[in-house]
Amino acid sequence: MAVFQIVQYPDPILREKAREVRKITPQIERLAVNLVDTMRRSGGVGLAAPQIGVSKRVIVVEDPEKNPIVLINPEIVRLEGDKETAEEGCLSVPGVWGQVERRMCLTVRGYNLEGKQVAYLVEGFTARAFQHEIDHLDGIVFLDRATTIYKRKE
């Protein structure tokens, strides 16, 4: 559909709590497609609506097979397993990286584009990506959670 410019930190929308989606409309469906297109074109593995300037609780995360998972009003319902510290970056904070501690297993729940409630048990890097994108919906960027922040050449 369309590729949007990624909102750059410290834009205020990245610090706002995104609004809940009350109804899945054609506008929300277009938003989901645009998130997927923008994520792929930008070389990301996840993207949240506030990152393209839209204050809605919608995210997309690629699964391990590179298929996009779109979730509306996502929430983490269970964190499990060990915590692991690993490098994270963000399309909204280009050229900056940090070491962030996250749980390596979680259950996330939300709604798909058909309006059905769905849940996913995810592990490893995918679990990290879901936590990162859901943080965006709550006005949190990875810099807030990083124990070390650094720049590196792309």
Swiss-Prot record:
Pfam families: Pep_deformylase. Fe cation binds at residues 90, 132, 136. GO terms for biological process: co-translational protein modification; translation. It comes from the Bacteria. InterPro entries: Peptide_deformylase, Peptide_deformylase_sf. HAMAP family: Pep_deformylase (MF_00163). This is Peptide deformylase. Keywords: Hydrolase, Iron, Metal-binding, Protein biosynthesis. Removes the formyl group from the N-terminal Met of newly synthesized proteins. Requires at least a dipeptide for an efficient rate of reaction. N-terminal L-methionine is a prerequisite for activity but the enzyme has broad specificity at other positions. The active site is at residue 133. It comes from Desulforudis audaxviator (strain MP104C). Its cofactor is Fe(2+). Belongs to the polypeptide deformylase family. The gene is def. Its EC number is 3.5.1.88. Binds 1 Fe(2+) ion. It catalyses: N-terminal N-formyl-L-methionyl-[peptide] + H2O = N-terminal L-methionyl-[peptide] + formate. CDD domains: Pep_deformylase. One of its GO terms (molecular function) is peptide deformylase activity.
